[in-house]
């Protein structure tokens, strides 16, 4: 679910997901997609592409199990679609952490009309 994604992002980055990434660049947040502005935005682009592969579950509402062990996200005992969703969320949270050093405050609330058409997944 969105709540689990936000929690993973907080655990990995130390940043509150909604204010930090909710409107970041062209790909972070609901419904947006465009040519990534930077590495952080590319994390979100890849995450949206990961979600597009999910056919039997809904990322916004369905919940999966995971745990936080030794500062590591461990996806739990889920059905195949929920497991894949958990792995998508885990990957974006780690990607955002790995790119914290290039997080650009100028992209925090980026006007979506300025986004150019995205590449295909």
From Swiss-Prot:
Any idea where this protein resides? Answer: Secreted
Give the start-end ranges of region Important for membrane-damaging activities in eukaryotes and bacteria.
Answer: 105-117
Q: Where is this site: Important residue of the cationic membrane-docking site (MDoS)?
A: 105, 108
Q: Which SMART domains match?
A: PA2c
Q: Which keywords annotate this record? A: Disulfide bond, Myotoxin, Secreted, Toxin
> What's the domain of life for this entry?
Eukaryota
- Please provide one cellular component term from the Gene Ontology annotations of this protein: extracellular region
Write down the position(s) of the site called Cationic membrane-docking site (MDoS). Answer: 112, 117
Q: Cite the record's note on assembly.
A: Monomer.
Record function comment: Snake venom phospholipase A2 homolog that lacks enzymatic activity but shows high myotoxic activities. In vivo, induces a mild edema when subcutaneously injected into mice foot pad.
Family in the record = Belongs to the phospholipase A2 family. Group II subfamily. K49 sub-subfamily.
Q: What is this protein called?
A: Basic phospholipase A2 homolog GodMT-II
Organism classification: Eukaryota, Metazoa, Chordata, Craniata, Vertebrata
